[in-house]
C-alpha cells in the first residue's frame, strides 16, 4: 500500500504529520505523493477538500482518509490522538467503503470554449460588480428568471456548508441529488423566482444562462477556488459519473456529525 499525505501548516497539524510519518515508516507503508492508493489528509474538512482537488485526476483509483486536528468533521473520521489505531487498521483490517457524489460543472464561454470542473461541496456564480441576472433551466426547460447576488449549487455533503447558511436543506450524502439555493434574490414582475431551495433528481441537470452584455464579468467558485471570465454563455450542473471514496474503519452516523457540528446537545439528553 502507498499513501500520500496532505496537510495544512498549523503547528498542531505538523506535529501529527511528524508522528504519522514515523508510524507509517515503522509499518513499512510507503509514502508516495505521486501515485498513492490512499490519500490521508490531516487538518480539517478544508484540508480534505484541498486533497481532493490535488488528486482529482486519480479520484477513480484512490481512497481518502481524514484525520481532524480539531473537532470531528464531516469528512474526517479520525482525531489526532487516534493515529496509532488508524495505522493499525490500515495494516490489519479490511475497511468498508463509502462513496459520495461529486458535482460536475461545464462552463461555456461567449467564445464557445468549454471548461469542465469538479466540486466536492458546491459551486456558485456571481457577478463581479453588479447584480446577477440569469435564466435557470432544469432538463433544458426554462424554469425561472433570477435576479440577485448569485446562485449556489451543492452536493449532499456540501449541503452542510455554504448552502446551509443560505437556508438550504441538509441532505444525507447517500442521496444522489443536487440542491440549488438563491443568494439574496430580488423578486419583481420581471424577475420571479421560487424563492426557495430546490432539490433535483440524479438524472436531471441545471443550466444557468447569465444575461449577456459588454460589461459582463462573472466569478464562478467551486469549493472555494475561482474561475473568472468576462463572458459566460451558460453553466451546466449535474451529478458527475465520478465519486469520491473513503475508507471507513469506524462509523460515525451522519446525523451524529450534524448534531455535533450545529447543535451540540448535552450528553444527559442522549
Swiss-Prot record:
Record-linked SUPFAM superfamilies: NAD kinase/diacylglycerol kinase-like (SSF111331)
Pfam families, per database record: NAD_kinase, NAD_kinase_C
Cellular compartment(s): Cytoplasm
Key word Transferase present: yes
Keyword field: ATP-binding, Cytoplasm, Kinase, NAD, NADP, Nucleotide-binding, Transferase
Single GO MF annotation: NAD+ kinase activity
Record-level GO BP terms: NAD metabolic process; NADP biosynthetic process
Primary residence: cytoplasm
Job of this protein: Involved in the regulation of the intracellular balance of NAD and NADP, and is a key enzyme in the biosynthesis of NADP. Catalyzes specifically the phosphorylation on 2'-hydroxyl of the adenosine moiety of NAD to yield NADP.
Name of protein: NAD kinase
